[in-house]
Amino acid sequence: MRTLWIVAVLLLGVEGSLVQFETLIMKIAGRSGLLWYSAYGCYCGWGGHGLPQDATDRCCFVHDCCYGKATDCNPKTVSYTYSVKNGEIICEDDDPCKRQVCECDRVAAVCFRDNIPSYNNNYKRFPAENCREEPEPC
């Protein structure tokens, strides 16, 4: 059900950050964020709670925290400008909100790439009832 919700949200806004985030993950990690990370662990997907289960789930936890620090904007819908140079994402907006959201997405995409070796299929479609621990602060 959580995966279907993510698909619906992604299809609603063609220009929003969630679609751009999917594109960045594909460019940097070489994987579809929707297929690999939309329902992984306690934090990858819509919402998050408990403790991150591994390094990949921690990427999502940090991304959630980063979005939470984006002030005066909606990180899930704002569009930003970026380029790819030598395999690296360069966030190009002068607007503080757009730049911050782009940086959140860039850091998460790099984190996913760097943690591909530790990706654990046991955390795919991880039951929410396994994420009941007290969350750590951002």
From Swiss-Prot:
Write down the chemical reaction(s) this protein catalyses.
a 1,2-diacyl-sn-glycero-3-phosphocholine + H2O = a 1-acyl-sn-glycero-3-phosphocholine + a fatty acid + H(+)
Q: Give the EC number.
A: 3.1.1.4
Q: In which tissues is it expressed?
A: Expressed by the venom gland.
Query: Superkingdom of the source?
Result: Eukaryota
Family matches, as SUPFAM superfamilies: Phospholipase A2, PLA2 (SSF48619)
Q: Name one GO molecular function term.
A: phospholipid binding
- Say which family it is in: Belongs to the phospholipase A2 family. Group II subfamily. D49 sub-subfamily.
Name-wise, this protein is: Acidic phospholipase A2 Cvv-E6h
Q: Which organism is it from?
A: Crotalus viridis viridis (Prairie rattlesnake)
